[in-house]
């Protein structure tokens, strides 16, 4: 008896997920494999991917356009949370996984499957994200993980596929592992595994190099409503179009490249190259607007919780109770985050040159000014400082007894 009768496989068209199709049927006795490929704005032509799955033995090959929910339900909450894993990585890949898992479960219910499957290996983060998300959404569904269990090297995996009649991958000579969607690209493996080796220019596709970036700076304005970006340079855009425009603007000035050593969920360190031009630009602008519109204690608390929010998403806990609770806090703070931020884009840098809010700003010029319009009561400072410093004076006096 096989491990499952009908399986829905998360499918990318790559080597591992293509080999998963015959492997599930021949080695694990699965009767029927249905594939699902998600369109997340990665720019791939999905019809060849759909046909490839059928040629590999899938009974059905489904494709789903998830671009709009990806941006509205996953990217925008990350912007509102200023989500940067380990202070740098804006979770461009991690944000896609819970959405794919959610749709995978929905497809499994629609076709009456008793299991879902993915092609993640045992060393990466995505296996955790898929398995935990599926467990949260459908604990009754079995999760099959052939690539984690088959113990084959990449060369052996390709050879297995060729024995099953699959064509050799076009990218067989490429040493890199690449994941991409509308938010960005992640590149790893090959020569990048040496942390001292500079990444070659060939690994980048969404951003120009600093040398190739324009010598003349460009100023732009980004407007936010309730913490969500809504327009660039006065042009109101739908969420997907806004991300595309932010990618274009930032990428054309060499903004959005990351080269970092990150701590994976499974306990190892890995070297990752990321390109996330638009997302990093929007988070920077959003942070700046919050500094103008949020009360000091709210802002400090939010900065602490942002790190935890990013950790939860990175670790695959999107559908967990703590993430849900933090969402409530984040959403409550954003009603006041309305306004415009101006940035100067130049040679890999986005420099804030202005910020304003007509209805939410907590910056009061008359209180901050040192000129004749100053309305701050300087005489009140003496009493405030006395009370503020009283614990220190009492502590100091006690030490001298």
Curated annotation (Swiss-Prot):
InterPro entries: Arginosuc_syn_C, Arginosuc_syn_N, Arginosuc_synth, Arginosuc_synth_CS, Arginosuc_synth_type_1_subfam, AS_cat/multimer_dom_body, Rossmann-like_a/b/a_fold. The keyword Ligase applies. One of its GO terms (cellular component) is cytoplasm. Transmembrane segments: none annotated. It comes from the Bacteria. GO terms for biological process: argininosuccinate metabolic process; L-arginine biosynthetic process; urea cycle. Keywords: Amino-acid biosynthesis, Arginine biosynthesis, ATP-binding, Cytoplasm, Ligase, Nucleotide-binding. L-aspartate binds at residues 121, 125-126. It is found in: Cytoplasm. GO terms for molecular function: argininosuccinate synthase activity; ATP binding. It catalyses: L-citrulline + L-aspartate + ATP = 2-(N(omega)-L-arginino)succinate + AMP + diphosphate + H(+). L-citrulline binds at residues 89, 125, 129, 177, 186, 262, 274. Pathway: Amino-acid biosynthesis; L-arginine biosynthesis; L-arginine from L-ornithine and carbamoyl phosphate: step 2/3. ATP binds at residues 10-18, 38, 119. Signal peptide: none annotated. Homotetramer. Belongs to the argininosuccinate synthase family. Type 1 subfamily. NCBIfam families: argG (TIGR00032), PRK00509.1 (NF001770). This is Argininosuccinate synthase. It comes from Synechococcus sp. (strain WH7803). The lineage of its organism: Bacteria, Bacillati, Cyanobacteriota, Cyanophyceae, Synechococcales. The gene is argG.
């Amino acid at each position: 008896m096989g491990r499952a009768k009908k399986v829905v496989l998360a499918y990318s068209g790559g080597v591992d997920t293509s080999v998963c199709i015959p492997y599930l049927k021949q080695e694990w006795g699965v009767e029927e494999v249905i594939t699902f490929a998600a369109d997340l704005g990665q720019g791939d032509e999905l019809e060849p991917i759909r046909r490839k799955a059928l040629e590999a033995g899938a009974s059905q090959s489904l494709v789903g356009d998830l671009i709009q929910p990806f941006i509205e339900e996953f990217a925008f909450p990350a912007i509102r949370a200023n989500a940067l894993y380990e202070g740098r990585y804006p979770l461009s890949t991690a944000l896609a996984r819970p959405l794919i898992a959610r749709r995978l479960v929905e497809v499994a219910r629609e076709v009456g499957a008793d299991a879902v499957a993915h092609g993640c290996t045992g060393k990466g983060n995505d296996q955790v994200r898929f398995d935990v998300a599926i467990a949260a959404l459908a604990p009754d569904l079995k999760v099959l993980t052939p690539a984690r269990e088959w113990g084959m090297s990449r060369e052996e995996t390709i050879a297995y596929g060729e024995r099953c009649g699959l064509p050799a991958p076009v990218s067989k000579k490429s040493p890199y592992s690449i994941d991409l969607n509308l938010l960005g690209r992640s590149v790893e493996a090959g020569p990048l595994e040496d942390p001292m080796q500079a990444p070659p220019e060939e690994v980048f596709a969404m951003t120009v190099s600093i040398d190739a970036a324009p010598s003349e700076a460009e100023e732009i304005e980004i407007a936010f409503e309730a913490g969500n970006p809504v327009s660039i340079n006065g042009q109101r855009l739908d969420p997907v179009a806004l991300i595309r425009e932010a990618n274009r603007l930032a990428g054309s000035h060499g903004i959005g490249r990351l080269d970092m050593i990150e701590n994976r969920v499974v306990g190892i360190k890995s070297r990752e190259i990321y390109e996330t031009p638009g997302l990093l630009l929007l988070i920077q602008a959003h942070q700046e607007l919050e500094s103008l519109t949020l009360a000091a204690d709210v802002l400090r608390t939010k900065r602490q919780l942002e790190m935890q929010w990013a950790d939860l998403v990175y670790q695959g806990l999107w559908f967990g109770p703590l993430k849900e609770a933090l969402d409530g806090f984040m959403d409550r703070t954003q009603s006041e985050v309305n306004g415009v931020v101006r940035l100067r884009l130049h040679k890999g840098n986005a420099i804030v040159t202005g910020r304003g809010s007509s209805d939410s700003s907590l910056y009061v010029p008359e209180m901050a000014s040192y000129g004749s319009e100053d309305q701050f009561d300087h005489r009140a400072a003496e009493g405030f400082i006395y009370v503020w410093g009283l614990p220190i004076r009492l502590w100091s006096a006690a030490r001298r007894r």
